[in-house]
């Protein structure tokens, strides 16, 4: 009996011990759960283990690498490559776009292998201390820990795959205020509940609007959302804290979030503390409605099909079809810019873009066109119409950098590697001249572009290889700077696009504000550094055998002397050369094909404008003649009043009044033209010759010969009976007029032939003015034969003077009138120093008359003058300044509109030598001399 009792007592004691141990264990576990895991706890391996929440929240994980990434950014590409190799990672070409990927991979590897590098121990400890549980998000504000509370946000899933676009603003933790009255209630709910769930909206690429309502892709699991993105081509997803926002994104309503430069708010919706409203707990967003509306509008361009990229775009690049290529990319910018602002892949497998193919196929024009289009803001606005200028420039710089420096997938070769490898010097010139190019990038075999020159083309010449090496060394230019004043020009220091931090020369020569402002007028290049320095020295101090001539050119031509010297040296050495021409408005070498084409277009436009101007002037002149000539017996008032000073109605009134006061003594008119004087001179001569004669005409009109006899070229005989002879004052007046015209012609033209031609043209123009007044028939055709005999005698007398040996024949005058010899120069019908400068620039150019007909005609017109005459031509500025002091011998429109036209002058207004602008002062002087001659004859 004793043994069973002892056994029962032992079992009871053992049971109580087990019960006590269980209670103690439960208490310990409760305490541990109550306190929660400490952030400084170590795992089994002895390394710091981040809490599960840190792994679940991408924002916290990225924040732990900030300091490490900042240290890696300080390393140069070679040191970074060594660290990547030491960490056991594969290293490819490190460029400005791929560097971030390698830095991120290296940072993750270093965090996992923290024991290898002692320099990262401190950082790991700090990173571990910074990680916090999402449930411990309450932060004190102004000493009160219960006033405000914040939740950590979920980082937006951006461009984490592939190459990153321009860095958007950092997504920071957003704290939303909670009313103090709800603090206790919120604390109770926060401790009992977990972090609010996330909703992932997947937005496919919809091809039409009705398809947006068919199905909505919203997931609560991130893996499911990623799987949906992989299955739906071209789709994207984003995390939201509410299902409504995720559904809006999936439908495409809230497509993008604001650009970094437009708002300071984060790109993705921010999870905030639950707020009480209408007795229900709702998830609020710290994003105002006004800023939510300000979204980036998605463009309507579709992703091109793979067949279009290969069959259309790539074929156009390979064949060098610039028009087809330009039409494709401007019709749809996604031919060049893919998702994530990455270059569009035109050849799968190797992942070639347009620049790879163009560099491989030696299509330098396609390379240049691609860069020009990508750097055009209008093209980028097709993709992002709502971006401001700053963000647009960031995108442009990013995309251009990707096109220039992105390696392919096989050998990590950049477009510059391809151009050098195949010996395409023109492509190397285009690529290496861009300021964003990386010339020392290494491929898979650790070779730079300079190391692979002509690897795939062994038969290339040594000169070509040397030229490619010079292109890779850098592009330098030798500039010529001029001031707006008459100070001497300055040959500037060497300049290169690579010089970003420091400028070799500034816009001012010197440091004083009183120094003149200098502008770029010409430059030689691109050249290698050695050639550019040699050319600069040669330009400043020419060789001894040419020093005298070049010094004379500089001193004798202060406007373009230095340009002429630099041009001759550059052409002699075969260096590229351009200079600025004001009338073209661009930098160009006129001796090149491009320069000749621009000059041809300019001269063609000048000729077209001149013809249109002449037609307009002829129409205006005919309208004025019809308005001022109402009949054959009308008195012309142009000798006493300009047409511009009186209206058409006033002219008609005065003509009618004169017709009523004068007897009709004029007979019928023919259609031939024979008068040698302007209308006003003839009126004065007739009044002075026959002041009281019964057959004198007060209107001053002379009458032509008989039509048939004039055409036969015979001189008409005066009819029998009354013969009215003009006094000798007529011959005196003719001689006086010729002397006056001869003096005017000599003052303008130095050669006697030109003076004679000018005089004949003026006489012919005056005859034509009278002819226009005599064309219309008048009511005086019905007068008697006596008046007709008087008219015939007067016409015969005037015809005799006009057809005398001292004057040109009538047929020659008509021929000159019908086909005047017009010579069009750069600034009108008169040459200037600019014509001489352009002729000097075309000295070594071969102008094809079939390809450049306008340039050939202009050059022939300039070469008609002797070198001494060309040296005396005024410059455009001086010519425009003194134009008002020179007589206008060529009549209206002697100058083409432009910089030579006098301000405020009417281009259709006749000049001093025109019949329509004969001054009353000259008429009165001529009248007095005619009367004195008449008295002397008596």
From Swiss-Prot:
Membrane topology: Single-pass type III membrane protein
Basic and acidic residues bias (residue ranges): 609-627
Localisation per UniProt entry: Endoplasmic reticulum membrane
Gene: ANKLE2
Domain LEM: 69-113
Signal peptide coordinates: none
This protein's name: Ankyrin repeat and LEM domain-containing protein 2
Outcome when changing residue 27 to G: In MCPH16; uncertain significance
PROSITE patterns linked: LEM (PS50954)
Residues in ANK repeats: 411-440
GO cellular component entries: endoplasmic reticulum; endoplasmic reticulum membrane; membrane
Organism of this sequence: Homo sapiens
GO molecular function: protein kinase inhibitor activity; protein phosphatase 2A binding; protein phosphatase regulator activity
Residue numbers of Phosphoserine PTMs: 259, 268, 488, 496, 512, 528, 662, 804, 896, 914
CDD domains: LEM_ANKL2
């Amino acid at each position: 009996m004793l043994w069973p009792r002892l056994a029962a007592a032992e079992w009871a004691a053992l049971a109580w011990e087990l019960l006590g141990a269980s209670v103690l264990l439960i208490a310990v576990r409760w305490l541990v759960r109550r306190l929660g895991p400490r952030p400084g706890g170590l795992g089994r391996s002895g390394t710091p283990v981040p809490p599960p929440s840190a792994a679940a929240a991408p924002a916290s994980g990225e924040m732990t690498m900030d300091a490490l990434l900042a240290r890696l950014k300080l390393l140069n590409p070679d040191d970074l490559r060594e660290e990547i190799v030491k960490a056991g990672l594969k290293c490819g070409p490190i460029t400005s776009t791929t560097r971030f990927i390698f830095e991120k991979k290296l940072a993750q590897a270093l965090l996992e292998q923290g024991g290898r590098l002692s320099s990262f121990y401190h950082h790991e400890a700090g990173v571990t201390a910074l990680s916090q549980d999402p449930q411990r998000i309450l932060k004190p504000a102004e000493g009160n820990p219960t006033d405000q509370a914040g939740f950590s946000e979920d980082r937006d899933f951006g461009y984490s795959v592939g190459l990153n676009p321009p860095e958007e603003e950092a997504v920071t933790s957003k704290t939303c205020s909670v009313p103090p009255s709800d603090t206790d209630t919120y604390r109770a709910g926060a401790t009992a509940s977990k972090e609010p769930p996330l909703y992932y909206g997947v937005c496919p690429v919809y091809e039409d609007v009705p398809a947006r309502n068919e199905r909505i892709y919203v997931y609560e699991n991130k893996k499911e959302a990623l799987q949906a993105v992989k299955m739906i081509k071209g789709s994207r997803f984003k995390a939201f804290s509410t299902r409504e926002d995720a559904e809006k994104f999936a439908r495409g309503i809230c497509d993008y979030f604001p650009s970094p430069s437009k708002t300071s708010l984060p790109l993705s919706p921010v999870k905030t503390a639950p707020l009480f409203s209408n007795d229900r707990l709702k998830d609020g967003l710290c994003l105002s409605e006004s800023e939510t509306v300000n979204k980036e509008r998605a463009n309507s361009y579709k992703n091109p099909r793979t067949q279009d990229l290969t069959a259309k775009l790539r074929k156009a690049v390979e064949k060098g079809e610039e028009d087809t290529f330009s039409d494709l990319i401007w019709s749809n910018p996604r031919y060049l810019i893919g998702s994530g602002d990455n270059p569009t892949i035109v050849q799968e497998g190797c992942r070639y873009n347009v620049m790879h193919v163009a560099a491989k196929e030696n299509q330098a024009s396609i390379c240049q066109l691609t860069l020009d289009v990508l750097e055009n803001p209008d093209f980028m606005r097709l993709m992002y119409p709502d971006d401001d200028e700053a963000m647009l420039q960031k995108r442009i710089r990013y995309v251009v950098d990707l096109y220039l420096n992105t390696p392919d997938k096989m050998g990590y070769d950049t477009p510059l590697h391809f151009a050098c490898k195949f010996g395409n010097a023109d492509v190397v010139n285009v690529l290496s001249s861009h300021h964003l190019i990386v010339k020392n990038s290494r491929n898979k075999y650790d070779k730079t572009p300079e190391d692979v020159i002509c690897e795939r083309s062994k038969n290339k010449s040594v000169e070509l290889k040397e030229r490619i090496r010079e292109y890779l060394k850098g592009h330098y230019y030798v500039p010529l700077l001029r001031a707006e004043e008459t100070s001497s020009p300055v040959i500037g220091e060497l300049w290169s696009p690579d010089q970003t931090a420091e400028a070799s020369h500034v816009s001012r020569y010197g440091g004083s504000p009183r120094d003149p402002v200098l502008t770029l007028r010409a430059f030689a290049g691109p050249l290698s550094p050695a050639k550019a320095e040699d050319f600069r020295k040669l330009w400043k101090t020419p060789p001894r055998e040419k020093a005298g001539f070049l010094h004379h050119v500089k001193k004798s031509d202060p406007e373009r002397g230095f340009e002429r010297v630099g041009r001759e040296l550059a052409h002699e050495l075969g260096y590229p050369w351009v200079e600025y021409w004001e009338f073209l408005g661009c930098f160009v070498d006129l001796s090149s094909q491009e320069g000749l084409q621009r000059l041809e277009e300019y001269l063609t436009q000048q000729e077209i404008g001149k013809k249109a101007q002449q037609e307009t002037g002829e129409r205006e002149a005919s309208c004025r003649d019809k308005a001022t000539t109402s009949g054959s017996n009308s008195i012309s008032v142009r000798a006493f009043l300009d047409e511009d000073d009186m209206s058409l109605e006033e002219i008609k009134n005065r003509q009618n009044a004169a017709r009523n006061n004068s007897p009709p003594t004029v007979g019928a008119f023919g259609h031939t033209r024979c008068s040698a004087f302007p209308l006003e001179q003839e009126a004065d001569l007739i009044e002075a010759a026959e002041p009281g004669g019964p057959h004198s005409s007060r209107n001053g009109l002379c009458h032509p010969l008989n039509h048939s006899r004039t055409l036969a070229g015979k001189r008409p005989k005066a009819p029998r009976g009354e013969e009215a002879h003009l006094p000798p004052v007529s011959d005196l007046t003719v001689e006086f007029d010729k002397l006056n015209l001869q003096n005017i012609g000599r003052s303008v033209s130095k050669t006697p032939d030109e003076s004679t031609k000018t005089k004949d043209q003026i006489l012919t123009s005056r005859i034509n003015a009278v002819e226009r007044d005599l064309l219309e028939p008048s009511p005086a055709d019905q007068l008697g034969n006596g008046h007709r005999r008087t008219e015939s005698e007067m016409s015969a007398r005037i015809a005799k003077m006009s057809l005398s040996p001292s004057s040109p024949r009538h047929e020659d005058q008509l021929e000159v009138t019908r086909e005047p010899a017009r010579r069009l120069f750069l600034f009108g019908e008169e040459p200037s120093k600019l014509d001489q400068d352009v002729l000097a620039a075309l000295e070594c150019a071969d102008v094809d008359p079939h390809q450049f007909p306008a340039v050939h005609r202009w050059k022939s017109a300039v070469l008609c003058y002797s070198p001494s005459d060309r040296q005396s031509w005024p410059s455009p500025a001086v010519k425009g300044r003194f134009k008002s002091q020179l007589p206008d011998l060529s009549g209206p429109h002697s100058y083409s509109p432009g910089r030579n036209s006098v301000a405020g002058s009417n281009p259709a207004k006749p000049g001093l030598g025109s019949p329509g602008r004969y001054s009353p002062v000259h008429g009165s002087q001529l009248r007095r001399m005619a009367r004195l001659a008449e008295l002397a004859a008596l």
